[in-house]
């Protein structure tokens, strides 16, 4: 591993630990030449997950886009960043554990909605309004009515 400070390729590992539920390794390293310390991460590289958009375009799955959408829905809600990280991790894990290397964007949206409905109902409605492209107040009311019915049948 090259030192990011001086470029030397002689570094020693001071500490290693598993992170992200054992799917990655965090290593604390020290340069043999300049003695500066830095952190590296090793992660298993899987074949990319491809998202098929509504219009048929294909693009590589972006964990960042998934997280940004959930963060937007949970803005100013009593939802911790840890809960959001867990949600993103679980959704991504579910997508990657499937047998398909291509996934419809609709499946991702539904997975987010299924998770948000249990986490925070306001965040669920916010996400649904964008994902399902609510055009008017009536559509909001319909979704709220469905949510109340689901809640009362539990």
UniProtKB/Swiss-Prot annotation:
Pfam families (UniProt xref): ATP-cone, Zn_ribbon_NrdR
InterPro entries attached to this UniProt entry: ATP-cone_dom, NrdR-like_N, RNR_NrdR-like
Required co-factors: Zn(2+)
GO biological process, any: negative regulation of DNA-templated transcription
Keyword DNA-binding in record: yes
Domain of life: Bacteria
UniProt keyword annotation of Zinc present: yes
ZnF (unnamed) ranges: 3-34
Domain ATP-cone: 49-139
PROSITE patterns found in the cross-reference section: ATP_CONE (PS51161)
Function statement: Negatively regulates transcription of bacterial ribonucleotide reductase nrd genes and operons by binding to NrdR-boxes.
Family to which this protein belongs: Belongs to the NrdR family.
Cited PANTHER family: TRANSCRIPTIONAL REPRESSOR NRDR
Name this polypeptide is given: Transcriptional repressor NrdR
Organism of origin: Desulfitobacterium hafniense (strain Y51)
High-level lineage: Bacteria, Bacillati, Bacillota, Clostridia, Eubacteriales
